[in-house]
Amino acid sequence: MTGGEGSFMLRFVLPTENDRDAVLSFYNEVEKSGGECIGFRYRNDYDRWLSDMRNRHAGKDLPQGYVREDFYICYDGADVVGVFSLKFELTDYLLNYGGHVGYAVRPSRRCEGIATRILAEGMNIARRSGFERLLCICDDDNYASEKVIIKNGGVLENTLYDPDEKVTVKRYWIGL
């Protein structure tokens, strides 16, 4: 899956063994920037992480509270510039505080429009998977993510306080 705009061409792939170095480079940069990122629970064990991603894709052997999820690595050329996650159902927690989608952009590639493009392509993936609308949620102080969601047609439904994370979130729906 590709799309072009400006000086980058995004390619979405489900992770394989061949993505090891590029994925680890991406997550190392995120960690060095002091940030956290969706999708990388096993920082020191790529094989375990890859097995976890495959199980999520298949919807098998999921930890309690987890749902079937497709997790994509987003490339620009040979470099991982971001990640995208699509969850296929909403638990009560996801309905209130998590949503259907998650995405992140490599710190050195932020402010290039990549997040907007990742979400737009993610919407295409969701549409082809039978979704009619997506729930996108961001922390109320994450103005960059809020801007991305709104650019992609997000309509604010409400804000909720997440007592587990001790943060207020904004809940947006995007019609597909």
List the model feature ranges, each with a label.
Residues 2-100, 125, 169-176:
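GNAT-family acyltransferases
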Residues 110, 136-146:
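Conserved beta-strand-loop-alpha-helix junction that forms the acyl-donor binding cleft
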Residues 89-91, 108, 141:
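Short coil/turn motifs at secondary-structure junctions
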Residues 126-137:
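Conserved GNAT acetyl-CoA-binding A-motif
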Residues 113, 130, 142:
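Conserved G/P- and acidic residue-centered "switch" motifs that form tight phosphate/ATP-binding loops
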Residues 137-138, 153-171:
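Conserved catalytic-core motifs of GNAT/GCN5-like acyltransferases
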Residues 129, 151-152:
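Structural motif
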